[in-house]
């Protein structure tokens, strides 16, 4: 493959980082996040990394991963460059996330798999294809199955057994085993990170004059990019405090803009097409309902010191099984329930349902979302795309029409309110 392909891999990240840095130049604490994200696209850094554990997606409970590995390396897709590297390795119907993730693991420019065990949750057909390709290429892979039901005791026990079996396999590779002490420490650490995520997003979404939507997404996703979860928490706390100070010192007059809720396929750095389109259409993101934000919303605590590790595992299995979205499942209640929670809390003007081509599990949920939104008088815009940028102009026209419709609705609402 040509070296220009690697340049496009890094250039995509550079372009996004440059845009976010320019638009948020007033935020001193943001610099660490920009540097952290860009490191993920540094060939020298990647060749030096040699992680022991590679995690595809965020379907596997973080509490389990941190109990048996100090520094899991997450692969979340998001890159058009890595997707191109995997074009010849995957069937045409493979979704962009899976193709991009495979490109991170098999490519001619860097190798992060040499000493690594790759773990993956089998939540879709594309994931099954990934496992086959990786094993054929000689990579070490351990898979965790997702049961087709999520509301039965048998499903929970099966899921718990899958977690424990996977943790034991990882522990043999990392030499850090699943003990009660390690599990409690991991639960405490992940809970702190999730609280910090929630505190930051709550502050950032009320400080829209000081930080852009793309910057908010980048900061939260650096939880998965940072070498150290503790370091991410430290810098996120500092940025949150900076935003709180700015909010108190300055009163910015903000233009009336429609607030939209994004749900569906995760929007992952560096491919920030969706927030770009939303901003260009004169709208703002009120919140995000995807697997990343849903994971951060889970509240799992270790309980009292007397609670057994087995009870903690039960709680982890129960919470994550209900939250996980799977194309093999009849109903995915996690995204729907979180959607209703966010709507009640934030009262968004509209919903943008982002679906990556091939991720049919989100299309399965769309009728339920649309029905609930219709009852609440909230318009829904379905946006299906991939990591390519050729459709930007077409999507921009459609998004601007959606934004204008929301604007007109808000104008009518304000007139009715004034005349009441």
Language model features: what each stretch is:
Residues 2-52, 168-300, 310, 328:
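A charged, amphipathic alpha-helical module
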Residues 51-109, 116-117, 123, 130-131, ...:
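An N-terminal, globular interaction/scaffold subdomain
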Residues 55-63, 121-128, 264-270, 357-364:
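Gly/Ser/Thr-rich loops at beta-strand to alpha-helix junctions
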Residues 56-78, 85-86, 261, 265-331, ...:
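Redox- and metal-dependent alpha/beta enzyme cores, enriched for Fe-S-associated oxidoreductases
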Residues 102-172:
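Acidic/His-rich segments in extracytoplasmic proteins that coordinate ligands and/or metal ions
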Residues 115, 343-352:
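Proline-aspartate-enriched helix->loop->beta-strand connector
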Residues 367-420:
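Peripheral docking tails and interdomain loops at the edges
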């Amino acid at each position: 493959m040509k070296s220009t392909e690697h340049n496009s891999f890094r250039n995509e990240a550079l372009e996004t980082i440059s845009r976010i840095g320019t638009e948020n130049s007033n935020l001193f604490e943001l610099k660490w996040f920009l540097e952290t994200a860009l490191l993920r696209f540094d060939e020298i850094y990647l060749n030096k990394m040699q992680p022991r554990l590679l995690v595809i997606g965020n379907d596997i409970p973080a509490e389990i991963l941190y109990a048996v590995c100090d520094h899991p390396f997450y692969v979340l897709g998001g890159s058009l460059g890595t997707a191109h590297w995997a074009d010849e390795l995957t069937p045409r119907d493979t979704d962009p996330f899976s193709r991009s993730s495979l490109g991170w693991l098999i490519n001619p420019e860097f190798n992060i798999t040499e000493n690594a065990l790759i773990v993956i949750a089998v939540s879709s057909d594309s994931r099954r294809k990934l496992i086959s390709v990786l094993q054929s290429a000689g990579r070490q892979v351990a898979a965790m199955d997702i049961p087709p039901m999520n509301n039965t005791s048998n499903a929970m026990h099966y899921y718990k057994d899958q977690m424990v079996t996977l943790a034991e396999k990882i522990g043999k590779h990392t030499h850090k085993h699943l003990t009660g002490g390690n599990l409690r420490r991991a639960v405490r650490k992940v809970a702190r990170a999730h609280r910090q995520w929630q505190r930051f997003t709550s502050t950032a979404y009320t400080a829209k004059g000081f930080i852009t939507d793309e910057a908010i997404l980048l900061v939260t996703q650096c939880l998965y990019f940072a070498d150290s979860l503790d370091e991410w928490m430290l810098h996120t706390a500092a940025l949150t405090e900076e935003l709180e100070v700015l909010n108190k010192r300055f009163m910015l007059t903000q233009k009336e803009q429609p607030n939209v809720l994004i749900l569906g396929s995760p929007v992952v750095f560096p491919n920030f097409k969706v927030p770009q389109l939303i901003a260009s259409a004169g709208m703002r993101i009120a919140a995000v309902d995807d697997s990343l934000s849903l994971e951060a919303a889970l509240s799992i605590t270790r309980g009292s010191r007397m609670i057994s590790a087995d009870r903690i595992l039960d709680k982890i299995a129960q919470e994550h099984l209900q939250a996980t979205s799977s194309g093999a499942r009849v109903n995915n209640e996690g995204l729907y329930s979180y959607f209703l929670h966010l709507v009640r809390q934030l009262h968004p003007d509209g919903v943008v349902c982002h679906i990556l081509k091939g991720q049919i599990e989100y299309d399965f949920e769309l009728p339920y979302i649309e029905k609930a939104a219709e009852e609440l008088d909230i318009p829904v815009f379905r946006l299906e795309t991939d990591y390519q940028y050729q459709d930007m102009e077409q999507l921009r026209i459609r998004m601007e029409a959606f934004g204008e419709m929301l604007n007109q609705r808000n104008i009518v609402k304000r007139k009715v309110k004034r005349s009441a």
